[in-house]
């Protein structure tokens, strides 16, 4: 029986079909992959074979690059190989590069890792996919997927996949991260100091001071610039400056500057000095200074503590200290050089006895009034005691009676010619000072307070000389003699005793005694006078003229 002849195409198909079914074919999805350090990656690989799957062996090999595709890409040799159609990263012998077995698996068994990958997280999944967890620095190279199937001798048993690890990029990222960390630390440090704040990033180290207020920073900056430019712009220190509450300001230390702040004319006119070659001032500084000056209220009253401290003007010496010290002003009597020593002694004693206690605080004008009466002193010395006695008898008819009664009631008193100068005529309503013996017995008594009438008349006679003697009631008289006292009738003496001055608490007021005494007694009398002046000054709290 003869077989029919088949056409030629069918004959070729029948002969090629068994050969194609018995061959091995390996395929990969990507021939080149990029990955960073410590990342995970899956290298896809698949195959077709006629052999049994349990007999197929999958092997992944690693070969390093001949030339690095990253660092050597712009080299001349690399570019020349690319121009010739070659692959300079993989076109070299295996003895010129490093070759390692990564993993191997037979059938569906567990993969076996290579010697250099025993501690790595690497596995083979699906048919032939390689999974690498945490890519390392030395994983940068070419990976070959090789399939071994028994009985398949033809075909392409392996495929390559380039794994490019961007380790240089990771290094750059690490460096940048370190710089960012330092910058973050610096930012947090700046945020903790608001006056030097440089950004507005919220930091975990100091969350309470983050997001610096722009107005506070600008105010602080303007104040520092104003303090730096203040001494250059003003010729004199700003005693009445805007910052009254500042401790550096000298405003509270000068009480004269606090006088009449509400009056525009009381403000000191401070000259402005023209400065040359000064750096330009920012507009913000000028605007801030103008705003502060507009808000300045010069008529604002002083705080109560400053009013209490500087309520009255003080002298130059007292203004240097922290407390106002009350001082007594003591004026010595003027010296008369044309008199003899005995006359100067007696006159100074009379001036000490006859100087009244001032009834108001001491004034410089009152102190100057002592020097306006040199003619009055000379007139007293020229006229003598006799002329004063004659005038006293002519003006006062009852003077002779009082003269006699004083001699009857008191012991004999001897007056010198110079001591009788104290008996100048004056009004009978002025106060007078007692002599030493009654004063010693009554030194503890407070002086009586003058009546309003006496104060008014004494104020009217303030410019009169102080060396006058008051009226001597109840028969005490420095002009009396023994004969006048004998001629005085008893009824007159009794009448004078009954009608003594109501200002004296006792019946017999103190009397003047003679000042013609020994030097020892004179010194004791001076001491008593000085003690009396000190005691009166301590009682009154006012100045005393000695």
From Swiss-Prot:
Residues 24-162 form the Ig-like V-type domain. Mainly expressed in prostate and to a lower extent in testis, pancreas, kidney, heart and liver. The modification Phosphoserine is found at residues 499, 501. Residues 1-23 form the signal peptide. Keywords: Cell junction, Cell membrane, Cytoplasm, Deafness, Disease variant, Disulfide bond, Immunoglobulin domain, Membrane, Non-syndromic deafness, Phosphoprotein, Receptor, Signal, Tight junction, Transmembrane, Transmembrane helix. Residues 442-457, 527-539 have a biased composition (Basic and acidic residues). It is a single-pass type I membrane protein. The chain crosses the membrane at residues 168-188. Disulfide bonds join 45-145. It comes from the Eukaryota. Belongs to the immunoglobulin superfamily. LISCH7 family. This is Immunoglobulin-like domain-containing receptor 1. The gene is ILDR1.
